[in-house]
Curated annotation (Swiss-Prot):
Lineage: Bacteria, Pseudomonadati, Pseudomonadota, Gammaproteobacteria, Pasteurellales
MF (Gene Ontology): rRNA binding; structural constituent of ribosome
This protein's name: Small ribosomal subunit protein uS14
GO biological process, one term: translation
Protein's UniProt keywords contain RNA-binding: yes
Self-association state and partner proteins as the record states: Part of the 30S ribosomal subunit. Contacts proteins S3 and S10.
Cited Pfam families: Ribosomal_S14
Annotated source species: Actinobacillus succinogenes (strain ATCC 55618 / DSM 22257 / CCUG 43843 / 130Z)
Function description: Binds 16S rRNA, required for the assembly of 30S particles and may also be responsible for determining the conformation of the 16S rRNA at the A site.
Keyword annotations: Ribonucleoprotein, Ribosomal protein, RNA-binding, rRNA-binding
The keyword 4Fe-4S belongs to this UniProt entry's keyword annotation: no
Length: 101
């Protein structure tokens, strides 16, 4: 199990990313626009740097919904490989069966 503080930190990062999403996209659009002036681009870069670090989506970590484990998380299920295997063996994931060839 992951520490509660680590789980809470990731939840905080998700909320911050949602809050600043529109503003980040607006600034990034100005920065990548070839028609905008150099001054506008520079101002946009400075404003983007002034946003909170945790507002960046790349700072988020995929974690297992049950345990909070940060590694080996399968996106399709939102669970770690260990919990997916346990759930699959109990038949709790519809359509998923053990491979056999």
């Amino acid at each position: 199990m992951a520490k509660q503080s680590m789980k809470a930190r990731d939840v905080k990062r998700v909320k911050l990313a949602e809050k600043f999403y529109a503003k980040r996209m607006e600034l990034k659009k100005i920065i990548s626009d070839a028609n905008s002036s150099d001054e506008d681009r520079w101002d946009a870069v400075l404003k983007l740097q002034s946003l909170p670090r945790d507002a960046s989506p790349s700072r988020q970590r995929n974690r297992c919904r049950q345990t909070g484990r940060p590694h080996g998380v399968l996106r399709k299920f939102g669970l770690s490989r260990i919990k997916v295997r346990e759930a699959a063996m109990r038949g709790e994931i519809p359509g998923l069966k053990k491979a056999s060839w």
